[in-house]
Amino acid sequence: MAKGRPREFDPDVALDQALRVFWKRGYEGASMPELTRAMGINRPSLYAAFGNKEELFRKAVQRYVEGPAGYVGKALAAPTAMEVAEKLWQGGIDMSTCPENPSGCLILRGSMGCGDSDRLRKELVSLRAMGERRLRERFEQAAAAGELPEGVSAADLARYVLAVMHGISMAATGGATREELMRVKELALKGWPGHSVTG
């Protein structure tokens, strides 16, 4: 009998399934039996391929950032600060209301439910802080180009955009419809610094 049977699962597919469980349940709420069942593997195979639960969660977060939340990087490349905000909010709506996705934001949900893993919570908070820094730097560029009204703080604007994003995520988790969230986005855009509403 041959030794070393080949793995009978696709690690990418298994990681996608783990991502969905963490996204739906959060880190603390995702049990090992639920994870192994969703991934279609046993515990030894999970540990061999992905490490422990904490390491699996880190890999799932990376997959989330590169996949479903990949719209963030594209939004930051938009030509104007207002378009950056619009694309971030629209991306959040699209992701949160897609029937194929669990609602809400994995990183927000994960950072609020890491249980005893203080190290993991700090990593997620650091990830969110990095996102805020990138957004602030983008708005600083816009301010230097004369795109924002004088006196508008790039840091405050970044916090505002993220607060709306987080609100969209939480509202979607609470059952808000796509149409309702689109109205929230349009209302937020009307309050953009220097944006004049005509009609």
Task: Locate the predicted segments by residue.
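Amphipathic alpha-helical packing segments from all-alpha helical-bundle domains
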Residues: 118-145, 156, 186
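Hydrophobic alpha-helical segments that form the core
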Residues: 103, 109, 152-171, 183-191
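Hydrophobic alpha-helical connector segments
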Residues: 59, 72-103, 154-161
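N-terminal intrinsically disordered/low-complexity leader segments
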Residues: 1-9, 151, 196-199
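Amphipathic C-terminal alpha-helical segment
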Residues: 95, 113, 141, 161-179, ...
